[in-house]
């Protein structure tokens, strides 16, 4: 079916509804299947593409110019180093530009090749974003072939056959398999990343696909993180006698991961230890407290999302990256809603009455994005102080 393509086309996106987007292939040669979403951030493409929360997804960047600051070894959010546990494809309006930044130590296109990320440039990302906004996040296959040869019918069939994210426990693949400690803090100019010399708190982080900047933000408030696999039991965690427990972000369906994680989270909540959940960790805490989660039509992906803190009345601009949400109507009486999205009114935070337990749907650690809600790590530290 290559005759259906325009001259010079070396990349396509085939959607499950039969739509074909044409352009110039970049990054890795080959194809990848996943859920197509859009991200509205203007910066931070390297952090986005290495965020484990994007596992099994193809990201369309709404900002047209990508690649101008290159890539480096510091802005990688994964801790596992397994490229397959992050975004598998990327869509751009313009061909990625040549880097010009003092921190760059590599070319974006070559970096995508090395990581196996299939790219497609020259796409009408505005039209694709409107399509996603109106009809939901489609299943798609992104393909790059330098000779311009594609079996379009086979690509569409592959997109149709993909089962999607619902029911998928991806956290087990994104998680570390070995326990380790972390003591690197947040970055600042001109010092670079801080070093935690004298930890004030010991925090166990359950890794469902944790971002490095969450660990750095913990170090910023004096917490040394011990990162454990997603399947770690509550008994093993409590045996370490931590000051608090962090439920990390991660990919996939929270209900699927919750099959083994929720019973352990319930034990941690019952222990009285301070618990702080972020993104997937927020959703699984909600499940552990008796609420439900549901799949979203278009999800929230970007660094410009307004969220209201109902406890203070303050509006914050935050980073979000999720395709599932907590069903507010399902929250049981002891659980109060603390944050809401001002885009669509969906839940963005909860707290448990009478317990040092809370979580948020957004990413207070940013990377990329604003740091309006970085104070939540201080709130967590305050709960650990009170519990000592």
Swiss-Prot record:
Keywords: Amino-acid biosynthesis, Arginine biosynthesis, ATP-binding, Glutamine amidotransferase, Ligase, Nucleotide-binding, Pyrimidine biosynthesis. The keyword Zinc does not apply. The active site is at 279 (nucleophile), 363, 365. It is an enzyme of class 6 (ligase). Residues 1-198 are annotated as: CPSase. InterPro entries: Anth_synth/Amidotransfase, CarbamoylP_synth_ssu, CarbamoylP_synth_ssu_N, CarbP_synth_ssu_N_sf, Class_I_gatase-like, CPSase_GATase1, GATASE. It comes from the Bacteria. One of its GO terms (biological process) is glutamine metabolic process. Residues 202-388 form the Glutamine amidotransferase type-1 domain. L-glutamine binds at residues 53, 250, 252, 280, 283, 321, 323-324. Its EC number is 6.3.5.5. Pathway: Amino-acid biosynthesis; L-arginine biosynthesis; carbamoyl phosphate from bicarbonate: step 1/1; Pyrimidine metabolism; UMP biosynthesis via de novo pathway; (S)-dihydroorotate from bicarbonate: step 1/3. One of its GO terms (molecular function) is carbamoyl-phosphate synthase (glutamine-hydrolyzing) activity. Composed of two chains; the small (or glutamine) chain promotes the hydrolysis of glutamine to ammonia, which is used by the large (or ammonia) chain to synthesize carbamoyl phosphate. Tetramer of heterodimers (alpha,beta)4. Small subunit of the glutamine-dependent carbamoyl phosphate synthetase (CPSase). CPSase catalyzes the formation of carbamoyl phosphate from the ammonia moiety of glutamine, carbonate, and phosphate donated by ATP, constituting the first step of 2 biosynthetic pathways, one leading to arginine and/or urea and the other to pyrimidine nucleotides. The small subunit (glutamine amidotransferase) binds and cleaves glutamine to supply the large subunit with the substrate ammonia. This is Carbamoyl phosphate synthase small chain. It comes from Caulobacter vibrioides (strain ATCC 19089 / CIP 103742 / CB 15).
């Amino acid at each position: 079916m290559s005759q259906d393509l325009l001259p010079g086309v070396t990349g396509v996106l085939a959607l499950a509804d039969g739509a074909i987007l044409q352009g110039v292939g970049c990054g890795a040669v080959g194809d990848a299947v996943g859920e197509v979403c859009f991200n509205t951030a203007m910066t931070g493409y390297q952090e986005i593409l290495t965020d484990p929360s994007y596992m099994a997804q193809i990201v369309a960047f709404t900002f047209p110019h990508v690649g101008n600051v290159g890539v480096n070894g510091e802005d990688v959010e994964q801790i596992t180093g397994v490229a397959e546990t992050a975004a598998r494809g990327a869509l751009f309006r313009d061909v990625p530009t040549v880097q010009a930044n003092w921190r760059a130590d590599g070319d974006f296109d070559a970096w995508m090749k090395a990581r196996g990320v299939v790219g497609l440039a020259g796409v009408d990302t505005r039209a694709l974003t409107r399509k996603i906004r109106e009809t939901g996040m489609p299943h798609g296959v992104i393909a790059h072939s330098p000779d311009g040869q594609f079996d379009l019918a086979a690509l569409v069939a592959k997109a149709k056959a993909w089962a999607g994210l619902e029911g998928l426990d991806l956290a087990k693949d994104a998680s570390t398999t070995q326990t380790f400690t972390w003591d690197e803090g947040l970055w600042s100019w001109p010092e670079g990343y801080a070093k935690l010399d004298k930890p004030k708190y010991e925090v166990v982080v359950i890794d469902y696909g944790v971002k490095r900047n969450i660990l750095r933000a913990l170090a910023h408030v004096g917490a040394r993180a011990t990162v454990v696999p997603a399947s770690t039991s509550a008994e093993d965690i409590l045996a370490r006698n931590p000051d608090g427990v962090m439920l990390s972000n991660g990919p996939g369906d929270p209900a699927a991961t919750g099959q083994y994680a929720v019973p352990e989270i319930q034990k941690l909540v019952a222990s009285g230890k301070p618990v702080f959940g972020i993104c997937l960790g927020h959703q699984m805490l909600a499940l552990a407290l008796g609420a439900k989660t549901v799949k979203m039509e278009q999800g929230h992906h970007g660094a410009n999302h307004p969220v209201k803190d109902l406890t203070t009345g303050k509006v914050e601009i935050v980073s979000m990256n999720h395709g599932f949400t907590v069903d507010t109507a399902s929250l049981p009486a002891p659980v109060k809603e603390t944050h809401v999205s001002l885009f669509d009114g969906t839940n963005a935070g909860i707290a448990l009455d009478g317990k040092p337990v809370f979580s948020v749907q957004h990413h207070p650690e940013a990377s990329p994005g604003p740091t309006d809600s970085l104070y939540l790590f201080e709130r967590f530290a305050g709960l650990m102080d009170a519990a000592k």
